[in-house]
Amino acid sequence: MKVLVVGNGGREHALAWKLLQSPKIDQVVCVPGNGGTATMKGCQNLPLAVDDFEGMSKYALENDIPLVVVGPEVPLAQGITDFLQTKGLKVFGPVQAGAQIEASKAWAKALMEAAGVPTAKAAVFTEPTAAKNYIRTERAPIVVKADGLAAGKGVIVAQTLEQAETAIDDIFQGQFGSAGNSVVIEECLLGQEVSVLALTDGLTIRPLLPAQDHKRIGEGDTGDNTGGMGAYAPAPIATPELMARVQTEVLEKTIAELRNKGIDYRGVLYAGLMVADNGDFKVLEFNCRFGDPETQVILSLLETPLEDLILACIDQRLAAMPPLAWKKASAATVVAASGGYPGNYEKGKVITGLDAAQLAGAIVFHAGTKLNSTAEIVTDGGRVLNITGLGEDFQQAIAQAYTGIKEIQFSRMYYRRDIGHCLLNEES
């Protein structure tokens, strides 16, 4: 079988890599893909934009590709699943109505409240004066969020009321474009963030291994938010007891409420949780797709064939699938970024050492890379590479990832040297 994977990041390289491990998958076509998918055996890139739904459907139908797996949230929010389904294609990813769970934080918050899902106290505003009046009745720190899609950068944790007011002004003045037509203001929760990604066919929902990522650009979890600078799985803080509660109090309630709204949600439901020191948790947000870079660690540990799970979700037979099988191991990913990210950065820097990193035992997933005119792999984004290590424990997995990343060079390359630092402190 052939599969079309939509997207060009590290998540999509990991999806293509995992799919190609199956003897049932002959070829993966990535739209538009990156330097890693361009050079991976069994994979090819198709240079179309992720919103060229007509072009994708035409190519898939002409080339006997029955299955489309959608990586990023933007095409899901634009209705790629609805469009391709009308052409007779099988699509993994929720319909446009379901993708609102990520595309509008206000919509997701209302859904959680209706479903009885534990979440932070919040209020929604469509103009700045009322928003500022509200924060003056609350206390800092307080969280200000652009309502719509902002590539993971539309959340500001304001430590003072002045910072909160500035964030409100920035959002309403268009810093995040149409994502900032309204704001969600939320109480600031303390604890550790955990990513619980789950697969659902609209009736049954099965969690994957819980993961944690490092969102801040700087070591010690400082500086600006990013799309994620590293991740590890399985997250020790997500105990079996906590995961059992997440299943009943979050995942099942959310899918039931989506059904109540007439939404047949099939694909990934990703719950971002804040877990307090006492073990209680609340949902910070939902995403409608695989996380990045969490996917890279989760799929590295998955033994069940990915296409079997994807097709079971699409065909609504997930309940009949056997329990998911996992490697008895730990995984860690370190992101190599362009200097200046998440601000301004340069592209087109030649990358060396990729083969050496893999020979050292790391898995190298490409994110912001491409082939230049002389077939060299060069940088093409803020987050460039995701170097992933596996091991019997986190110490081994993290060491493997860092052994790999030390083989890689490009101009102004930056990576955090403390991914998983809290785990190493616990293990030692």
What are these regions (language model features)?
Residues 154, 158-295:
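Internal nucleotide-binding/catalytic subdomain
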Residues 92-153:
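A conserved helix-loop-beta module that forms one wall/lid of the active-site cleft
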Residues 369-374, 378-428:
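Generic C-terminus detector
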Residues 39-41, 57, 100-106, 218-219, ...:
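Short, charged, surface-exposed secondary-structure boundary motifs
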Residues 45-51, 123-127, 158:
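Short acidic-hydrophobic, aromatic-tinged amphipathic segments that line or gate anion-handling sites
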Residues 247-269, 287-359, 372:
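Active-site "cap" helix and flanking loop/linker of ATP-utilizing ligase/carboxylase catalytic domains
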Residues 1-96:
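ATP-binding N-terminal substructure of ATP-dependent carboxylate-amine bond-forming enzymes
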